[in-house]
Amino acid sequence: MDTTVAAMLELGAQTDRIRVAIGPTIQQASYEVGPDFRETFLAESPDSAALFIPGRDDRYQFDLPGYCRQRLDRLGVHSIHDTGLDTCALEETYFSNRRRNHRGEPDYGRNASVIMLSL
């Protein structure tokens, strides 16, 4: 995100005119991570603690869209819409590599993203 926003600014964009849509993407309820993953984020910024809630055993649930919002906010981008759509949970609608790995399924899908610049 940092590199993308920087490139946009170099092309003449202004942070107050940048609009961001997050998602569909994996949501916190589906994104289980280990303590080492959490520690990496906490070492970068103590504010990252808010992105993790306790999961089962020593695991945590990570808020990826929240992380994106946090990073964008630090970059001065504040117009952010999060779809709230969970690619892992909505299996009839979206492919999820995490879901596929957990189930041992063959690789069968992809998602695409679009970035539009209008100066």
What are these regions (language model features)?
Residues 1-119:
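Active-site microenvironment for binding and transforming phosphate-containing groups
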